């Protein structure tokens, strides 16, 4: 199969878990270790350049891909182990065949993006090694896959450098089983984090909506307060105008009050003079009234006398009038007798 070839060393290397110190040293030297992956998340440009240089040095070498017993219990997940030779230790590995091969474990979420593994051909001395093929060793694609996967780091004892020995297949199976468990835990944690992210997004959306509503309410409140402030300002101006008018009216009223007080004083003086005059007139009227009464009594007596004289003269006139009427009737009767006499004589 393309992308797989036999290792250049005569003696096969086995994968075992090394000590922490040696693992840390090899991690620092290996550009494809888990620490380099963490560095790629922090300094992506630096790791990308290092990985490109490492791939350029190893371009004439090939890796062998194997499919190990890494099937998950549910039959749907497959854990793949990548294996790369350290380009910085290439000369030492050529001189000493017993030196350790460097490798790094990566989460299955990252490794699944690089394609399936193929079984190794016969003649590998019974060793099981896991790695990428030559066609999968493009530095840019590998670094991009690491940068796209943001996962928590596995336990310290599970991501160090490992080696295989011909008689330690049980150790490799135990390591693979631990890696499978770690992969399942990481996948569960990934799902849990995704659900948390969804909940946080929903919470963020609701909070953003609340913020927008509060902003709208705040704007409306500010507009209302501005309108109320304008109304209050207009009311204050109107009140100030009213106060000015009231002060003017009060000043006018005070002037009128002073004038009225002066007039009241004058009127009181006049009233006192009028009262004195009335008292004097009353005193003078009493004396005049007595004289008027006497004169009126005399006039009444004279009038009674005149009336009695007038009544007697009236009686005389009535008697003369009756006599005159009697004379007139006699004259009329004489005229009638004369006419009758004249008519009776031939």
Curated annotation (Swiss-Prot):
One of its GO terms (cellular component) is early endosome. It is found in: Cytoplasm; Early endosome; Endosome; Recycling endosome. Signal peptide: none annotated. Residues 46-77, 93-129, 153-173 are annotated as: Disordered. GO terms for biological process: cell division; cell projection organization; positive regulation of cilium assembly; positive regulation of protein localization to cilium. Its main location: cytoplasm. This is Endosome-associated-trafficking regulator 1. It comes from Xenopus tropicalis. The lineage of its organism: Eukaryota, Metazoa, Chordata, Craniata, Vertebrata.
């Amino acid at each position: 199969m393309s992308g797989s070839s036999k290792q250049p060393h005569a003696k096969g290397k086995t994968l075992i878990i090394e000590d922490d110190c040696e693992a840390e040293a090899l991690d620092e030297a290996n550009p494809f270790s888990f620490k380099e992956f963490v560095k790629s998340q922090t300094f992506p440009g630096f790791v990308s350049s290092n990985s490109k240089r490492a791939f350029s040095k190893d371009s004439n070498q090939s890796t062998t891909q194997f499919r190990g017993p890494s099937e998950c219990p549910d039959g749907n997940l497959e854990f793949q182990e990548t294996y790369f030779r350290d380009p910085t230790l290439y000369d030492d590995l050529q001189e000493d065949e017993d030196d350790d091969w460097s490798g790094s474990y990566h989460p299955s979420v990252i490794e699944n993006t690089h394609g399936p593994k193929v079984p190794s051909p016969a003649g590998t001395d019974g060793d099981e090694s896991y790695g990428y093929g030559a066609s999968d060793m493009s530095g840019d694609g590998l670094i991009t896959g690491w940068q796209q996967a943001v996962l928590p780091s596995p336990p310290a004892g599970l991501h160090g450098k490992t080696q295989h020995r011909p008689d330690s297949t049980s150790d490799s199976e135990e390591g693979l089983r631990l890696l499978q468990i770690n992969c399942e835990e990481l996948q569960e944690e990934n799902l849990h984090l995704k659900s948390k992210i969804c909940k946080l997004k929903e919470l963020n959306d609701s909070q953003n909506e609340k913020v927008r509503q509060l902003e709208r309410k705040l704007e409306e409140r500010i507009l209302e307060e501005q309108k109320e402030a304008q109304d209050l300002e207009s009311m204050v101006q109107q009140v100030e105008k009213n106060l000015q008018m009231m002060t003017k009216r009060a000043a006018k009223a005070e002037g009128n009050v002073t004038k009225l007080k002066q007039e009241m004083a004058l009127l009181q003086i006049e009233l006192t003079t009028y009262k004195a005059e009335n008292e004097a007139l009353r005193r003078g009227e009493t004396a005049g009234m007595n004289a008027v009464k006497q004169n009126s009594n005399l006039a009444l007596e004279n009038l009674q006398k005149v009336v009695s004289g007038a009544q007697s003269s009236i009686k005389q006139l009535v008697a003369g009038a009756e006599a005159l009427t009697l004379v007139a009737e006699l004259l009329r009767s004489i005229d009638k007798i004369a006419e009758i006499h004249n008519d009776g004589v031939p």
